[in-house]
């Protein structure tokens, strides 16, 4: 199995640099054919940030892009349960994807509520503002 860095994932989904896109696609296809692709949580959190901040994609587009990527053939996810739950919350919520990953990681080990200073995130069940 091969791990792909955020910058390669960006090229795969944004398609904004012809040379790097072609190289990324060849590498991805090769990995899928041979041993598969591993996507770490942090790479996907970074990908969402890049798509939102650098490419100005809206929440719905980012969520759809991430769903396509993580459901691709040959992909293995770190903490699949956490990522799917965080993505569901992100698609319907107000907070950042990274916040929902933190929440769902805590939930997965029974560590709730999540304490935060983020008022948007605090509108989520199992999240409380620090008084």
What are these regions (language model features)?
Residues 1, 103-131:
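Acidic, PIN/NYN-like endoribonuclease modules and their adjacent C-terminal/linker elements
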Residues 13, 28-29, 70, 84-87, ...:
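Regular secondary-structure segments
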Residues 48-52, 67, 87:
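Amphipathic alpha-helical segments within well-ordered protein domains
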Residues 74-115:
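Active-site neighborhoods of divalent-metal-dependent phosphate/nucleic-acid chemistry enzymes
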Residues 1-39, 54-61, 67, 131:
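Short, well-structured N-terminal submotif of metal-dependent ribonuclease cores
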Residues 11-13, 50, 124-125:
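Residues that scaffold the ATP/ADP-binding catalytic core of kinase and kinase-like folds
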Residues 33-34, 72, 93, 124:
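Structured helix-beta-strand junction loops
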């Amino acid at each position: 199995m091969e791990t792909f860095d955020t910058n390669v994932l960006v090229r795969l989904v944004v398609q904004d640099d012809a040379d790097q896109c072609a190289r990324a696609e060849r590498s991805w296809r090769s990995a899928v054919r041979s041993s598969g692709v591993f996507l770490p949580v942090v790479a996907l959190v970074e990908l969402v940030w890049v798509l939102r901040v650098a490419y100005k994609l809206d929440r719905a587009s980012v969520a759809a892009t991430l769903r396509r990527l993580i459901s691709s053939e040959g992909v293995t996810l770190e903490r699949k349960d956490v990522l799917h739950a965080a993505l569901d919350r992100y698609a319907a919520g107000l907070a950042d994807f990274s916040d929902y990953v933190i929440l769902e990681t805590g939930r997965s080990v029974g560590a709730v509520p999540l304490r935060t200073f983020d008022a948007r995130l605090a509108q989520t069940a199992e999240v409380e503002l620090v008084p």
